[in-house]
Swiss-Prot record:
Pathway: Lipid metabolism; phospholipid metabolism. Its EC number is 2.3.1.274. It is an enzyme of class 2 (transferase). It catalyses: a fatty acyl-[ACP] + phosphate = an acyl phosphate + holo-[ACP]. It is found in: Cytoplasm. This is Phosphate acyltransferase. Catalyzes the reversible formation of acyl-phosphate (acyl-PO(4)) from acyl-[acyl-carrier-protein] (acyl-ACP). This enzyme utilizes acyl-ACP as fatty acyl donor, but not acyl-CoA. The keyword Transferase applies.
Amino acid sequence: MKIVIDLMGADHGVLPIIEGVSRALENKSFSVVLVGDKDKATPFISKELASKVEMIHTQDYIKMEEAATEAIKRKESSIYLGMDILKNGADALISAGHSGATMGLATLRLGRIKGVERPAICTLMPSVGKRPSVLLDAGANTDCKPEYLIDFALMGYEYAKSVLHYDSPKVGLLSNGEEDIKGNTLVKETHKMLKAYDFFYGNVEGSDIFKGVVDVVVCDGFMGNVVLKTTEGVASAIGSIFKDEIKSSFKSKMGALMLKNAFGILKQKTDYAEYGGAPLLGVNKSVIISHGKSNARAVECAIYQAISAVESQVCLRITQAFESLKSQSFESQSDQQDA
């Protein structure tokens, strides 16, 4: 298995990415192609690691303040070169750089899976249960039609089943209430269409994401990104509040010591790094979009995520799902019309 790693554009430079690759190679067997500035990367690459990776040198990359459309013009940029390597035989690509550039190039260079109108960013959200919830779209498509959300539901369902190995995953539609009549025009129209699928649970509220009421939560990219960023902010704020309160007295410090294991589990469940990155579903190869501020652990977990996606053949599974499940929807709608 060959995984392409974009070294450029992350908030903390190349070091966390290289450290993450090194840690992953200690636990998994895979080939690595690093794409980026060799002069910046070499000081952090040990002789042992150098023997395990291939390095493609380029100094160009799409900066965060640049438009995503720049990516298609800059054929020597790290993400363009990386996407070409993926297109021509590699199995997966991971980038913590410009997410818009990654999404745009993946769609244009790799192509969409037949039947998919819009690829979507799929992210894992912590829940009170033993397994996380899947949320999509987390930011790829801010303006959506009902048909797009149907695609997101199909892809999220297949990802939960094939990659995460959830039995009979249930899909919920994010709304401002559980009742069928709740929601804006987009939600109401999507709800009518999703009723044709056996996996559809119904509407869910924001709080249900973290209760694990359903396995997959579907929404437009604007709402999904707001949910994601709000969750990150709340988790960070709670962590800061805990730290301040623990330091406030000797009694608090002793209590924290007794609850050390519980705090460790809480941190693991709410730490974005443990979830790796966000798969871009709907394109013909596995692409993982990592957080710009990714540390070594986040990169390591993103690699494991990519390996799982490739081993489970998620792109093929989604292709097959669109052939069979969309047929199920068509037959169901035809039966309703005949009735």
